Amino acid sequence: MLMLLTFFAEHMTPLNVFRYITFRTGGAMITSALIVFLFGPSIINSLRVRQGKGQPIRADGPQTHFKKAGTPTMGGLMIMTGILVSCLLWANLASVYVWVVLLVTVGFGAIGFYDDYLKVTKQSDKGFSGKARLGIEFLIAAVAAFVIMRAGQEPFSSSLTFPFAKQFVVNLSWFFIPFAAFVMVGAGNAVNLTDGLDGLAIVPVMVAAASFGFIAYLSGNAIFADYLQIHFVPGTGELAVVLGAVIGAGLGFLWFNAPPAAIFMGDTGSLALGGMLGTVAVATKHEIVLAIIGGLFVVEALSVIIQVGSFKLTGKRVFLMAPIHHHFEKKGWTESQVVIRFWIVAIILAMIGLSTLKLR
Protein backbone atom coordinates (compact mmCIF):
# COMPACT_ATOMS: atom_id res chain seq x y z
CA MET A 1 0.00 0.00 0.00
CA LEU A 2 2.83 2.40 0.82
CA MET A 3 4.16 1.71 -2.69
CA LEU A 4 1.45 4.12 -3.87
CA LEU A 5 3.49 6.95 -2.40
CA THR A 6 5.99 6.51 -5.24
CA PHE A 7 3.46 8.15 -7.56
CA PHE A 8 4.25 11.42 -5.79
CA ALA A 9 8.03 10.89 -5.93
CA GLU A 10 8.35 13.25 -8.88
CA HIS A 11 7.38 16.11 -6.60
CA MET A 12 8.78 14.68 -3.36
CA THR A 13 12.07 12.92 -4.13
CA PRO A 14 12.46 11.26 -0.67
CA LEU A 15 9.42 9.10 -1.47
CA ASN A 16 11.57 7.20 -3.97
CA VAL A 17 12.85 5.22 -1.00
CA PHE A 18 9.62 3.18 -1.11
CA ARG A 19 10.73 1.73 -4.44
CA TYR A 20 13.58 -0.15 -2.73
CA ILE A 21 12.87 -3.70 -1.63
CA THR A 22 15.53 -3.52 1.07
CA PHE A 23 13.92 -0.45 2.67
CA ARG A 24 10.46 -1.98 2.60
CA THR A 25 11.79 -5.26 3.99
CA GLY A 26 13.17 -3.41 7.00
CA GLY A 27 9.91 -1.50 7.37
CA ALA A 28 7.90 -4.72 7.23
CA MET A 29 10.12 -6.32 9.85
CA ILE A 30 9.78 -3.43 12.30
CA THR A 31 6.04 -3.07 11.71
CA SER A 32 5.20 -6.74 12.29
CA ALA A 33 7.40 -6.86 15.39
CA LEU A 34 5.66 -3.82 16.88
CA ILE A 35 2.21 -5.24 16.13
CA VAL A 36 2.99 -8.49 17.96
CA PHE A 37 4.74 -6.70 20.83
CA LEU A 38 1.89 -4.24 21.36
CA PHE A 39 -1.11 -6.50 20.87
CA GLY A 40 0.44 -9.74 22.13
CA PRO A 41 -0.48 -9.34 25.83
CA SER A 42 -4.16 -8.64 25.11
CA ILE A 43 -4.37 -11.55 22.65
CA ILE A 44 -2.73 -13.91 25.16
CA ASN A 45 -5.09 -12.84 27.94
CA SER A 46 -8.10 -13.27 25.67
CA LEU A 47 -7.00 -16.75 24.57
CA ARG A 48 -6.27 -17.77 28.17
CA VAL A 49 -9.79 -16.80 29.25
CA ARG A 50 -11.47 -18.46 26.28
CA GLN A 51 -9.44 -21.67 26.35
CA GLY A 52 -9.53 -22.34 30.07
CA LYS A 53 -7.27 -25.38 30.42
CA GLY A 54 -5.21 -24.37 27.38
CA GLN A 55 -3.37 -26.80 25.14
CA PRO A 56 -3.58 -30.44 26.32
CA ILE A 57 -0.26 -32.00 27.35
CA ARG A 58 0.71 -35.44 26.01
CA ALA A 59 0.38 -38.04 28.76
CA ASP A 60 3.37 -40.01 27.42
CA GLY A 61 5.60 -36.94 27.19
CA PRO A 62 8.47 -35.89 29.47
CA GLN A 63 7.42 -35.23 33.06
CA THR A 64 8.75 -31.67 32.87
CA HIS A 65 5.99 -30.80 30.38
CA PHE A 66 3.15 -31.23 32.86
CA LYS A 67 3.98 -27.91 34.50
CA LYS A 68 3.00 -26.26 31.20
CA ALA A 69 -0.64 -27.23 31.69
CA GLY A 70 -2.95 -24.27 31.26
CA THR A 71 -0.76 -22.46 28.74
CA PRO A 72 -2.93 -21.09 25.90
CA THR A 73 -2.27 -22.05 22.30
CA MET A 74 -3.15 -20.51 18.89
CA GLY A 75 -0.28 -18.03 19.21
CA GLY A 76 -0.02 -18.25 15.45
CA LEU A 77 -2.87 -15.73 15.35
CA MET A 78 -0.45 -13.11 16.69
CA ILE A 79 2.15 -14.01 14.09
CA MET A 80 -0.26 -14.05 11.15
CA THR A 81 -1.81 -10.74 12.18
CA GLY A 82 1.61 -9.11 12.26
CA ILE A 83 2.59 -10.59 8.90
CA LEU A 84 -0.63 -9.75 7.08
CA VAL A 85 -0.94 -6.15 8.30
CA SER A 86 2.74 -5.51 7.64
CA CYS A 87 2.59 -6.99 4.13
CA LEU A 88 -0.51 -4.99 3.24
CA LEU A 89 1.41 -1.86 4.21
CA TRP A 90 4.87 -2.55 2.80
CA ALA A 91 4.65 -5.18 0.03
CA ASN A 92 3.93 -4.47 -3.62
CA LEU A 93 0.40 -5.83 -3.86
CA ALA A 94 0.67 -5.99 -7.65
CA SER A 95 2.95 -9.03 -7.24
CA VAL A 96 1.17 -12.34 -7.80
CA TYR A 97 3.84 -14.09 -5.73
CA VAL A 98 2.99 -12.01 -2.66
CA TRP A 99 -0.68 -12.97 -2.91
CA VAL A 100 0.04 -16.66 -3.49
CA VAL A 101 2.33 -16.86 -0.46
CA LEU A 102 -0.12 -14.98 1.76
CA LEU A 103 -3.07 -17.11 0.63
CA VAL A 104 -1.19 -20.33 1.40
CA THR A 105 -0.23 -18.87 4.78
CA VAL A 106 -3.82 -17.99 5.62
CA GLY A 107 -5.17 -21.27 4.23
CA PHE A 108 -2.76 -23.45 6.18
CA GLY A 109 -3.22 -21.23 9.23
CA ALA A 110 -7.00 -21.74 9.06
CA ILE A 111 -6.52 -25.52 8.99
CA GLY A 112 -4.19 -25.27 11.98
CA PHE A 113 -6.65 -23.02 13.81
CA TYR A 114 -9.44 -25.58 13.42
CA ASP A 115 -7.09 -28.33 14.60
CA ASP A 116 -6.11 -26.29 17.67
CA TYR A 117 -9.76 -25.50 18.35
CA LEU A 118 -10.71 -29.18 18.37
CA LYS A 119 -7.79 -30.08 20.64
CA VAL A 120 -8.63 -27.36 23.16
CA THR A 121 -12.37 -28.00 23.24
CA LYS A 122 -11.96 -31.79 23.47
CA GLN A 123 -8.87 -31.52 25.72
CA SER A 124 -7.23 -34.17 23.56
CA ASP A 125 -4.18 -34.31 21.32
CA LYS A 126 -6.45 -35.74 18.62
CA GLY A 127 -7.63 -32.85 16.49
CA PHE A 128 -8.62 -32.60 12.84
CA SER A 129 -8.76 -35.90 10.93
CA GLY A 130 -5.31 -36.51 9.44
CA LYS A 131 -6.60 -37.56 6.02
CA ALA A 132 -9.05 -34.66 5.75
CA ARG A 133 -6.40 -32.20 6.89
CA LEU A 134 -3.84 -33.43 4.36
CA GLY A 135 -6.45 -33.45 1.63
CA ILE A 136 -7.31 -29.78 2.16
CA GLU A 137 -3.64 -28.85 2.46
CA PHE A 138 -2.84 -30.54 -0.86
CA LEU A 139 -5.79 -28.82 -2.52
CA ILE A 140 -4.61 -25.37 -1.39
CA ALA A 141 -1.01 -26.18 -2.32
CA ALA A 142 -1.98 -27.51 -5.76
CA VAL A 143 -3.86 -24.31 -6.57
CA ALA A 144 -0.87 -22.26 -5.42
CA ALA A 145 1.51 -24.39 -7.51
CA PHE A 146 -0.66 -23.93 -10.59
CA VAL A 147 -0.69 -20.14 -10.16
CA ILE A 148 3.09 -20.07 -9.65
CA MET A 149 3.66 -22.19 -12.76
CA ARG A 150 1.41 -19.97 -14.87
CA ALA A 151 3.00 -16.79 -13.51
CA GLY A 152 6.53 -17.94 -14.32
CA GLN A 153 8.52 -17.91 -17.52
CA GLU A 154 8.54 -21.05 -19.66
CA PRO A 155 10.31 -23.45 -19.62
CA PHE A 156 11.69 -22.67 -16.16
CA SER A 157 8.27 -22.23 -14.51
CA SER A 158 7.85 -26.02 -14.30
CA SER A 159 11.50 -26.99 -13.87
CA LEU A 160 13.48 -28.41 -10.98
CA THR A 161 16.95 -27.02 -10.34
CA PHE A 162 19.83 -28.47 -8.35
CA PRO A 163 22.13 -26.40 -6.11
CA PHE A 164 25.44 -28.15 -6.85
CA ALA A 165 24.79 -28.67 -10.57
CA LYS A 166 23.27 -25.41 -11.71
CA GLN A 167 23.32 -26.30 -15.40
CA PHE A 168 21.32 -29.46 -14.76
CA VAL A 169 17.61 -28.69 -15.03
CA VAL A 170 14.73 -31.16 -15.11
CA ASN A 171 11.50 -30.01 -16.72
CA LEU A 172 8.74 -31.59 -14.66
CA SER A 173 5.98 -30.34 -16.96
CA TRP A 174 2.59 -30.85 -15.29
CA PHE A 175 4.18 -33.11 -12.66
CA PHE A 176 5.48 -29.84 -11.23
CA ILE A 177 2.10 -29.25 -9.57
CA PRO A 178 2.04 -32.40 -7.37
CA PHE A 179 5.76 -31.99 -6.68
CA ALA A 180 5.35 -28.37 -5.60
CA ALA A 181 2.28 -29.25 -3.54
CA PHE A 182 4.30 -31.96 -1.78
CA VAL A 183 7.01 -29.40 -0.93
CA MET A 184 4.48 -26.96 0.54
CA VAL A 185 2.55 -29.56 2.51
CA GLY A 186 5.73 -31.29 3.63
CA ALA A 187 7.24 -28.03 4.85
CA GLY A 188 4.06 -27.10 6.70
CA ASN A 189 3.84 -30.39 8.55
CA ALA A 190 7.59 -30.60 9.21
CA VAL A 191 7.53 -27.24 11.01
CA ASN A 192 4.38 -28.39 12.80
CA LEU A 193 6.20 -31.46 14.15
CA THR A 194 9.16 -29.33 15.24
CA ASP A 195 6.97 -27.07 17.36
CA GLY A 196 7.11 -29.06 20.59
CA LEU A 197 9.27 -27.04 22.98
CA ASP A 198 9.31 -23.39 24.07
CA GLY A 199 11.02 -21.38 21.35
CA LEU A 200 12.15 -24.45 19.40
CA ALA A 201 10.34 -23.84 16.10
CA ILE A 202 10.19 -20.06 15.81
CA VAL A 203 13.94 -19.37 15.73
CA PRO A 204 14.72 -21.92 12.97
CA VAL A 205 11.73 -20.49 11.07
CA MET A 206 13.23 -16.99 11.35
CA VAL A 207 16.63 -18.31 10.26
CA ALA A 208 15.05 -19.98 7.23
CA ALA A 209 13.00 -16.84 6.49
CA ALA A 210 16.12 -14.67 6.57
CA SER A 211 17.92 -17.11 4.28
CA PHE A 212 15.08 -17.25 1.78
CA GLY A 213 14.59 -13.50 1.97
CA PHE A 214 18.15 -13.22 0.70
CA ILE A 215 17.52 -15.90 -1.95
CA ALA A 216 14.29 -14.24 -3.09
CA TYR A 217 16.02 -10.89 -3.45
CA LEU A 218 18.80 -12.43 -5.56
CA SER A 219 16.43 -14.54 -7.66
CA GLY A 220 14.34 -11.50 -8.47
CA ASN A 221 17.34 -9.44 -9.57
CA ALA A 222 18.56 -10.15 -13.11
CA ILE A 223 22.13 -8.99 -12.44
CA PHE A 224 22.66 -11.00 -9.25
CA ALA A 225 20.91 -14.06 -10.69
CA ASP A 226 23.14 -14.00 -13.76
CA TYR A 227 26.30 -13.59 -11.66
CA LEU A 228 25.39 -16.48 -9.35
CA GLN A 229 24.05 -18.60 -12.22
CA ILE A 230 20.71 -19.12 -10.53
CA HIS A 231 17.38 -18.81 -12.30
CA PHE A 232 16.07 -15.29 -12.62
CA VAL A 233 12.41 -15.27 -11.55
CA PRO A 234 10.99 -11.76 -12.08
CA GLY A 235 8.84 -10.55 -9.22
CA THR A 236 10.11 -12.92 -6.54
CA GLY A 237 12.31 -10.21 -5.03
CA GLU A 238 9.13 -8.85 -3.46
CA LEU A 239 8.96 -11.97 -1.30
CA ALA A 240 11.88 -10.56 0.70
CA VAL A 241 9.40 -8.03 2.11
CA VAL A 242 7.02 -10.82 3.14
CA LEU A 243 9.84 -12.75 4.80
CA GLY A 244 10.99 -9.60 6.56
CA ALA A 245 7.52 -9.44 8.09
CA VAL A 246 7.90 -13.08 9.17
CA ILE A 247 11.16 -12.31 10.97
CA GLY A 248 9.65 -9.32 12.76
CA ALA A 249 6.54 -11.21 13.82
CA GLY A 250 8.75 -14.11 14.90
CA LEU A 251 10.84 -11.86 17.12
CA GLY A 252 7.69 -10.46 18.69
CA PHE A 253 6.31 -13.93 19.28
CA LEU A 254 9.58 -15.22 20.74
CA TRP A 255 9.30 -12.51 23.42
CA PHE A 256 6.21 -14.32 24.73
CA ASN A 257 7.20 -17.86 23.73
CA ALA A 258 10.59 -17.82 25.48
CA PRO A 259 10.67 -20.33 28.36
CA PRO A 260 8.54 -20.50 30.34
CA ALA A 261 6.20 -19.78 27.45
CA ALA A 262 3.20 -17.53 28.01
CA ILE A 263 1.65 -18.93 24.83
CA PHE A 264 2.23 -21.73 22.34
CA MET A 265 2.36 -21.22 18.58
CA GLY A 266 -0.01 -24.09 17.96
CA ASP A 267 -0.82 -25.63 14.61
CA THR A 268 -2.25 -22.23 13.69
CA GLY A 269 1.25 -20.80 13.44
CA SER A 270 3.43 -23.79 12.60
CA LEU A 271 1.38 -24.96 9.61
CA ALA A 272 1.10 -21.40 8.29
CA LEU A 273 4.81 -20.62 8.61
CA GLY A 274 5.93 -23.96 7.19
CA GLY A 275 3.54 -23.66 4.27
CA MET A 276 4.83 -20.16 3.60
CA LEU A 277 8.46 -21.32 3.51
CA GLY A 278 7.57 -24.15 1.15
CA THR A 279 5.72 -21.78 -1.18
CA VAL A 280 8.62 -19.31 -1.27
CA ALA A 281 11.03 -22.16 -2.07
CA VAL A 282 8.81 -23.25 -4.97
CA ALA A 283 8.39 -19.71 -6.30
CA THR A 284 12.14 -19.00 -6.24
CA LYS A 285 13.05 -22.43 -7.71
CA HIS A 286 15.03 -23.44 -4.62
CA GLU A 287 13.03 -26.43 -3.42
CA ILE A 288 16.09 -28.62 -2.79
CA VAL A 289 17.89 -25.80 -1.00
CA LEU A 290 14.90 -25.67 1.37
CA ALA A 291 15.70 -29.26 2.38
CA ILE A 292 19.18 -28.05 3.38
CA ILE A 293 18.28 -24.76 5.06
CA GLY A 294 15.27 -26.39 6.70
CA GLY A 295 17.18 -29.59 7.42
CA LEU A 296 16.18 -29.46 11.08
CA PHE A 297 12.52 -29.65 10.07
CA VAL A 298 13.30 -32.52 7.69
CA VAL A 299 14.99 -34.52 10.46
CA GLU A 300 12.09 -33.91 12.84
CA ALA A 301 9.61 -35.16 10.23
CA LEU A 302 11.75 -38.16 9.29
CA SER A 303 12.06 -39.17 12.95
CA VAL A 304 8.27 -39.46 13.16
CA ILE A 305 8.03 -41.38 9.87
CA ILE A 306 10.79 -43.78 10.96
CA GLN A 307 9.26 -44.24 14.41
CA VAL A 308 5.77 -44.99 13.10
CA GLY A 309 7.04 -47.17 10.25
CA SER A 310 9.32 -49.20 12.51
CA PHE A 311 6.61 -49.78 15.10
CA LYS A 312 4.09 -50.92 12.49
CA LEU A 313 6.55 -53.25 10.75
CA THR A 314 8.51 -54.67 13.70
CA GLY A 315 6.65 -53.60 16.81
CA LYS A 316 9.79 -51.80 17.99
CA ARG A 317 10.57 -48.11 18.35
CA VAL A 318 13.79 -46.59 17.03
CA PHE A 319 13.63 -43.52 19.28
CA LEU A 320 12.65 -43.20 22.92
CA MET A 321 10.01 -40.77 21.71
CA ALA A 322 9.24 -38.91 18.49
CA PRO A 323 9.63 -36.25 17.19
CA ILE A 324 13.34 -36.44 17.86
CA HIS A 325 13.53 -33.43 20.20
CA HIS A 326 11.55 -35.50 22.73
CA HIS A 327 14.04 -38.36 22.27
CA PHE A 328 16.83 -36.12 23.52
CA GLU A 329 14.70 -34.99 26.45
CA LYS A 330 14.20 -38.63 27.38
CA LYS A 331 17.99 -39.07 27.10
CA GLY A 332 18.43 -36.48 29.84
CA TRP A 333 18.94 -33.22 27.96
CA THR A 334 17.17 -30.28 29.54
CA GLU A 335 14.61 -28.43 27.45
CA SER A 336 16.93 -25.42 27.13
CA GLN A 337 19.79 -27.64 25.94
CA VAL A 338 17.62 -29.22 23.24
CA VAL A 339 16.26 -25.87 22.07
CA ILE A 340 19.56 -23.99 21.93
CA ARG A 341 21.47 -26.87 20.34
CA PHE A 342 18.77 -27.25 17.70
CA TRP A 343 18.99 -23.49 17.04
CA ILE A 344 22.72 -23.91 16.44
CA VAL A 345 22.08 -26.76 14.01
CA ALA A 346 19.51 -24.63 12.15
CA ILE A 347 21.99 -21.75 11.78
CA ILE A 348 24.75 -24.07 10.51
CA LEU A 349 22.39 -25.66 7.98
CA ALA A 350 21.29 -22.21 6.79
CA MET A 351 24.92 -21.23 6.17
CA ILE A 352 25.48 -24.44 4.22
CA GLY A 353 22.32 -23.82 2.19
CA LEU A 354 23.31 -20.24 1.37
CA SER A 355 26.79 -21.38 0.34
CA THR A 356 25.20 -23.36 -2.49
CA LEU A 357 24.37 -20.06 -4.19
CA LYS A 358 28.04 -19.61 -4.99
CA LEU A 359 29.03 -23.24 -5.54
CA ARG A 360 28.82 -24.33 -9.16
Curated annotation (Swiss-Prot):
Co-factor requirement: Mg(2+)
GO BP, one annotated term: cell division
Recorded metabolic or biological pathway in which this protein acts: Cell wall biogenesis; peptidoglycan biosynthesis
Molecular function per GO: metal ion binding; phospho-N-acetylmuramoyl-pentapeptide-transferase activity; UDP-N-acetylmuramoyl-L-alanyl-D-glutamyl-meso-2,6-diaminopimelyl-D-alanyl-D-alanine:undecaprenyl-phosphate transferase activity
Cytoplasm in keyword set: no
Keywords on record: Cell cycle, Cell division, Cell inner membrane, Cell membrane, Cell shape, Cell wall biogenesis/degradation, Magnesium, Membrane, Metal-binding, Peptidoglycan synthesis, Transferase, Transmembrane, Transmembrane helix
Any one GO CC term of the record: plasma membrane
The reaction(s) this protein catalyses: UDP-N-acetyl-alpha-D-muramoyl-L-alanyl-gamma-D-glutamyl-meso-2,6-diaminopimeloyl-D-alanyl-D-alanine + di-trans,octa-cis-undecaprenyl phosphate = di-trans,octa-cis-undecaprenyl diphospho-N-acetyl-alpha-D-muramoyl-L-alanyl-D-glutamyl-meso-2,6-diaminopimeloyl-D-alanyl-D-alanine + UMP
Pfam families membership: Glycos_transf_4, MraY_sig1
UniProt enzyme class: transferase
InterPro entries: Glycosyl_transferase_4 (IPR000715), PNAcMuramoyl-5peptid_Trfase (IPR003524), PNAcMuramoyl-5peptid_Trfase_CS (IPR018480)
EC numbers for this chain: 2.7.8.13
Entries under CDD domains matching the protein: GT_MraY
Subcellular location: Cell inner membrane
Transmembrane segments: 27-47, 71-91, 93-113, 128-148, 168-188, 199-219, 239-259, 262-282, 288-308, 337-357
Protein's membrane topology: Multi-pass membrane protein
UniProt similarity note: Belongs to the glycosyltransferase 4 family. MraY subfamily.
Function, in words: Catalyzes the initial step of the lipid cycle reactions in the biosynthesis of the cell wall peptidoglycan: transfers peptidoglycan precursor phospho-MurNAc-pentapeptide from UDP-MurNAc-pentapeptide onto the lipid carrier undecaprenyl phosphate, yielding undecaprenyl-pyrophosphoryl-MurNAc-pentapeptide, known as lipid I.
Full protein name: Phospho-N-acetylmuramoyl-pentapeptide-transferase
Organism of provenance: Brucella anthropi (strain ATCC 49188 / DSM 6882 / CCUG 24695 / JCM 21032 / LMG 3331 / NBRC 15819 / NCTC 12168 / Alc 37) (Ochrobactrum anthropi)
